[in-house]
Amino acid sequence: MRLLGKIAIVTGAASGFGAGIARKFIAEGAQVMLADLNGAGVQTLAAELGDTAASYQLDVADRTQVTALAADVEAQFGALDIVVNNAGVTHLPTPMETVSEADFDRVFAVNCKSIYLASQIFIPAMKQRKSGVFLNVSSTAGISPRPNLNWYNASKGWVNTATETMAIELAQSGIRVNALNPVAGETPLLKSFMGEDTPEIRAKFLSTIPLGRFSTPEDMANAALYLCSDEASMITGVCLRVDGGRCI
């Protein structure tokens, strides 16, 4: 088991990539706190996954809630080893000047501020132990942006830069920081990216992916498992593309 004895938090764990990562981590021996704004969703998944899973209803952009989550993880499982910042949102495809300020604020709060808060709240204890892993789920949107998703693209570019900056600053503290850059996947966000889910629009999206398919929760879980395991002990600052060749 590649994560035996490890304690992890996965945000956005009620569905999609987050649920896939949580399932994989537990199968590989980790104890996992599943956190999501959808409290009922993570509660149901945690019950399915058994005693090594717990759930927490969480707004990742709320400092008070993230602080309380840290205390809850410590009380239930012990010292935290892995933080997977997976929670993410987008605005609907639209010209950049028509995106509402509320949607802009929501995108940057969930996609960016969440990582800032997680770093403030979880890193001090990791520094004391001289060990820990952060994994930030970004997107190919931060590398090769699509039109009409401007502020989402920008938020994911921020995630990639933040990941590299965190990695270089935290390396001497024994903390590794990496990111995953998935192409659009079969998750609840897919319809939001496309604007409308039709066979024609799906075909247009797929035509930009050389391997010819969307990413899956299993694809992301396999990549996350490697980067968060001790097998990747020499890997930090990497923004790994899980994109079927889209960004080539």
Which residue stretches match the model-derived regions?
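C-terminal substrate-recognition "lid" of short-chain dehydrogenase/reductases
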Residues: 2, 116, 213-242, 247
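Canonical Rossmann dinucleotide-binding motif of NAD(H)/NADP(H)-dependent dehydrogenases/reductases
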Residues: 3-33
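The beta1-alpha1 cofactor-binding region of Rossmann-like NAD(H)/NADP(H)-dependent oxidoreductases
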Residues: 39-40, 58-69, 101, 218
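Substrate-binding pocket helix/loop in short-chain dehydrogenase/reductase
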Residues: 94-96, 100-105, 201, 205
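Active-site helix of classical SDR
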Residues: 119, 155
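Alpha-helical segment proximal to the catalytic Tyr-Lys
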Residues: 124, 168-172, 233
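Residue(s) in the substrate-gating loop at a strand-loop-helix junction
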Residues: 139
